[in-house]
Each structure stands twice: as C-alpha cells, then as structure tokens.
Amino acid sequence: MKKDIHPEYVDCTVTCACGNTFKTKSNKSEIRIDICDKCHPFFTGSEKIVDSAGRVEKFKKKYAQK
C-alpha cells in the first residue's frame, strides 16, 4: 500500500435508534443506524413496523380503495 493516501482507520462507536451501542473500526468515529441486531424483528422474534419517513401512510393513501 502507498503511504499517506489512505483514510485514517479509527475506533468507531455505532449507535442504534433503540439505544444499543457497540464498537468497531471505520473511517468515521461515530455512526448512527436505525435498526440493529438487538431490535431487528428477525433476531428478536417479535414483529414491529419500522416507518421512519411515513412511507406506510403514503402507500395507503396512494392505493386506498375509492
């Protein structure tokens, strides 16, 4: 690898919307995510709707029975 052309590789704190945090390595020092393994329905076994931008309401409004 060439010297002085690669971004710095630092410790990173990943923060989920549910409050879970964990450490990893990245080019960024902090990353925020919407869903992680502690709150994802596949891993928890519970079903919940994740709608951060109102997409479900927009879909229902667009395709509502008239």
From Swiss-Prot:
Q: How is the cofactor bound?
A: Binds 1 zinc ion per subunit.
UniProtKB keywords: Metal-binding, Ribonucleoprotein, Ribosomal protein, RNA-binding, rRNA-binding, Zinc
Residue numbers binding Zn(2+) = 16, 18, 36, 39
Q: Which SUPFAM superfamilies match?
A: L28p-like (SSF143800)
- What's any one GO cellular component for it? ribosome
BP terms from Gene Ontology: translation
Q: Looking at the keywords, is Ribonucleoprotein present?
A: yes
Query: Which GO molecular function, any one, fits this protein according to its record?
Result: structural constituent of ribosome
InterPro entries per record = Ribosomal_bL28/bL31-like_sf (IPR034704), Ribosomal_bL31 (IPR002150), Ribosomal_bL31_A (IPR027491), Ribosomal_bL31_sf (IPR042105)
Q: Which cofactor does it need?
A: Zn(2+)
Report the domain of life of the source organism.
Bacteria
PANTHER family from the UniProt entry: 50S RIBOSOMAL PROTEIN L31, CHLOROPLASTIC, LARGE RIBOSOMAL SUBUNIT PROTEIN BL31C
Q: In which family does this protein belong, per the annotation?
A: Belongs to the bacterial ribosomal protein bL31 family. Type A subfamily.
Quaternary structure and partners: Part of the 50S ribosomal subunit.
NCBIfam families according to UniProt: L31, PRK00019.1, PRK00528.1
The free-text function statement in the UniProt record for this protein reads:
Binds the 23S rRNA.
- Its recorded name reads Large ribosomal subunit protein bL31
Write down the species. Answer: Campylobacter concisus (strain 13826)
Q: What is the lineage of its organism?
A: Bacteria, Pseudomonadati, Campylobacterota, Epsilonproteobacteria, Campylobacterales
Gene name, Swiss-Prot/TrEMBL? rpmE
